């Protein structure tokens, strides 16, 4: 199973969104045995992402990680996830594409 898209959330905003926080979303998806491909592959912690997926108003100084690919653990061990480079994509959108390649 794969759930991918713009979730408009990150654990950095959990306190602002009590009752429907990002951590609760990750927990709920975990109950369906789904994990973040990005965090699994890169070994990063939710809320401490190095690579942003959004540049608010296309401003490089206002970057956040709010787009995710949640996948089953089996898929997470055999996939590749790339996030588009701002130099290539920022003129098209404030969100960078998530490119999930599956090994079948």
Task: Write out the residue ranges for each language-model feature.
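Short proline/glycine-enriched turn/loop segments at secondary-structure junctions
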Residues: 56-59, 87-91
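Metal-dependent phosphoesterases centered on the DNase I-like endonuclease/exonuclease/phosphatase
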Residues: 1-66
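Surface polyanion/phosphate-binding segment centered on an Asp-His-Pro turn
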Residues: 91-104
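A short pocket-lining beta-strand/turn micro-motif at the edge of beta-sheets
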Residues: 62-66, 77, 96
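Low-complexity, intrinsically disordered Gly/Pro/Thr-rich segments
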Residues: 76-89
């Amino acid at each position: 199973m794969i759930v991918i898209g713009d979730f408009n959330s990150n654990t950095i905003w959990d306190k602002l969104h009590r009752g429907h926080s990002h951590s609760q979303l990750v927990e709920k998806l975990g109950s369906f045995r789904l994990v973040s491909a990005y965090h699994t592959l890169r070994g990063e912690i939710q809320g401490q992402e190095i690579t942003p997926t959004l540049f608010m108003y296309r401003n490089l100084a206002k970057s956040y990680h709010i787009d995710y690919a949640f996948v089953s653990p089996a898929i997470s061990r055999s996939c590749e996830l790339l996030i588009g480079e701002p130099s290539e994509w920022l003129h098209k959108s404030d969100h960078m594409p998530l490119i999930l390649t599956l090994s079948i």
